[in-house]
């Protein structure tokens, strides 16, 4: 594994490396994007904020920067990311490259906020890419799984530093369906978690607030990220272990965790402190993005499959909204989306669950999250993305020898 400390060093490493060349980040992708028997690159020595342009509302960061490490320096500069997911351990290059997202009907993925990037090609050339320079590469490269080249710097749109107030509560699932449009439109961020064998959901909203920011709670490690302590995660993992050993208790455990509403209540924090949540229970995950208008029908059908087949497990289904974008391989290309995520505890076989629900996602025209488990390959994926052929043409032009394709990506990209 090679670990460059500068863009020049990165370019030399890529130019001279034995293929396939892949970049490893924080290991938060479930798909084998980084596996290689060639050259593995780490950008851990290429981290930090390069600069903040307050007038243009943008910040440039080094590609190896972890999302959690950007929060405080950006905040100190008076800005924050416009949106994040509930995990902030990822490297920004990997999060952008796979279309990682949070929730919010007026907010896109992290990729949609990319205003420019610097890309090291297979030949070791460094390209500056933006709407005004190498525009085609910028258009296609914002979500590109590292198959066009290696990011060295990324420029993101940012907002003036802001506070968010979080509210969590339990509501009947039937009420959630009736009020879904209203809840989506009334809040900057809305999502819910549904334990499919329960009749209630755990809803969550985040809205901009001027309330005083309370001191973070929990251990010192959690304080810097504004997270709650992880006692509830330990209880939840115990429940997962019980369900693995005694599958018949899955339903009662799901109803217990729903009605216990772990994490219920309200709190206010700076945005970078409140977006992330403690995630200490390991799992495997599948996520698809379906048209937003079909989201409620799709998740209900997913839950019905789980109930009908009595598939054991304790993890909830997660439901979020993401705004459409124009990125060629984005799951949100040209359509507002609802993302639906199913999880299985790492101690259990995930295949029975994922094999059962994936056809439901296909029925609704779902596009898979690039970093999460799915079974689609190039022939099927090409039917989901109108710009597929144009992207593949761009990829072959930039990397004619397929230097950035490992075995998995050859199947996904079509060789």
Stretches with model-predicted labels:
Residues 261-384:
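Substrate-recognition/cap regions that form aromatic- and gly/pro-loop-enriched pockets
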Residues 1-89, 96-104, 192:
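Glycine-rich N-terminal segment of FAD-binding domains in flavoprotein oxidoreductases
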Residues 75, 125-127, 331-332, 351, ...:
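Non-transmembrane, aqueous-exposed alpha-helical and coiled segments at domain scale
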Residues 1-3, 56-57, 161-165, 341:
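Short, basic, glycine/proline-bearing loop/turn elements
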Residues 364-415:
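Activity-critical C-terminal alpha-helical subdomain
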Residues 31-50, 102-124, 150-157:
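Structural signature of FAD isoalloxazine-binding scaffolds in flavoprotein oxidoreductases
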Residues 115-308, 313:
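C-terminal substrate-binding/cap subdomain adjacent to the FAD-binding core in PCMH-type
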């Amino acid at each position: 594994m090679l670990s460059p400390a500068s863009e020049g060093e990165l370019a030399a490493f890529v130019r001279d490396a034995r293929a396939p060349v892949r970049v490893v980040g924080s290991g938060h992708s479930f798909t084998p994007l980084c596996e290689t028997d060639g050259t593995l690159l780490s950008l851990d020595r290429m981290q930090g904020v390069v600069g903040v342009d307050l007038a243009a509302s943008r910040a440039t960061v080094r590609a190896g920067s972890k999302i959690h490490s950007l929060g405080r320096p950006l905040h100190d500069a008076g800005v924050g990311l416009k949106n994040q997911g509930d995990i902030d351990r990822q490297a920004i290059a990997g999060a952008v490259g796979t279309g990682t997202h949070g929730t919010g009907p007026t907010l896109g993925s992290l990729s949609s906020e990319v205003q420019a990037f610097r890309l090291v090609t297979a030949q070791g050339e460094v390209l500056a890419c933006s709407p005004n320079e190498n525009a085609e590469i910028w258009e296609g490269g914002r979500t590109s799984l590292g198959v066009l080249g290696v990011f060295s710097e990324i420029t993101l749109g940012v907002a003036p530093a802001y506070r968010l107030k979080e509210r969590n509560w339990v509501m009947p699932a039937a009420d959630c369906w009736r009020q879904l449009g209203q809840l989506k439109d009334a809040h900057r961020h809305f999502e819910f978690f549904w334990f499919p064998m329960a009749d209630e959901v755990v809803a969550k909203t985040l809205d901009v607030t001027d309330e005083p920011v309370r001191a973070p709670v929990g251990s010192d490690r959690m304080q810097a990220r504004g997270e709650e302590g992880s006692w509830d995660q330990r209880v939840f993992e115990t429940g997962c272990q019980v369900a693995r050993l005694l599958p018949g208790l899955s339903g009662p455990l799901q109803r217990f965790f729903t009605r216990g509403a772990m994490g219920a209540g309200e709190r206010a924090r700076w945005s970078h402190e409140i977006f992330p949540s403690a995630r200490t229970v390991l799992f495997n995950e599948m996520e698809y993005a379906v048209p937003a208008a079909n989201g409620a029908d799709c998740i209900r059908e997913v839950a019905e499959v789980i109930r009908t087949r009595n598939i054991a497990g304790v993890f909830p289904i997660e439901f979020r909204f993401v705004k459409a974008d124009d990125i060629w391989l984005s799951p949100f290309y040209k359509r507002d989306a609802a993302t639906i995520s199913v999880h299985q505890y790492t101690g259990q076989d995930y295949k029975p669950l994922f094999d059962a629900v994936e056809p439901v996602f296909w029925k609704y025209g779902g596009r898979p999250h690039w970093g999460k488990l799915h079974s689609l390959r190039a022939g099927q994926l090409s039917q989901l993305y109108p710009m597929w052929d144009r992207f593949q043409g761009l990829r072959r032009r930039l990397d004619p020898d397929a230097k950035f394709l490992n075995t998995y990506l050859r199947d996904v990209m079509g060789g």
